[in-house]
Amino acid sequence: MTVNNAVAKRISNLLLERNMSQYRLEQESGIQHGSMQCIMNGRNKTVTLSTVIMLARGFDISLTEFLDDEIFCSEDLETEQ
């Protein structure tokens, strides 16, 4: 699994946990709909740290909380080049 796929999966899990819509996350985070679609559909080759910070703020959690998930601890996690 790539880092980008892991971020998309983490977003999906948090949306479900918080009973939150993707639209609301876009509004709260300031991420454009098209950009969010690219992240969620795997068309985005690189998710920047700035984007992850915006996502965390959209969920009203810290960056540490966003990244504190076993999905990011996998030794099989790959980076895109």
Question: In which residue ranges do the predicted regions lie?
Answer:
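A short, Lys/Arg-rich alpha-helix, primarily the initiator
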Residues: 1-21
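DNA major-groove recognition helix of helix-turn-helix
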Residues: 15, 40, 51, 67
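Short, basic-rich loop-to-helix N-cap that marks the start of a DNA-contacting helix
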Residues: 43-57
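Short alpha-helical DNA-recognition segment
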Residues: 20-38
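The alpha-helix within a helix-turn-helix
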Residues: 15, 26, 56
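Short, charged recognition helix plus adjacent turn
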Residues: 38, 67-81
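Residue-level detection of the helix-turn-helix DNA-binding "recognition helix"
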Residues: 16, 30, 41, 71
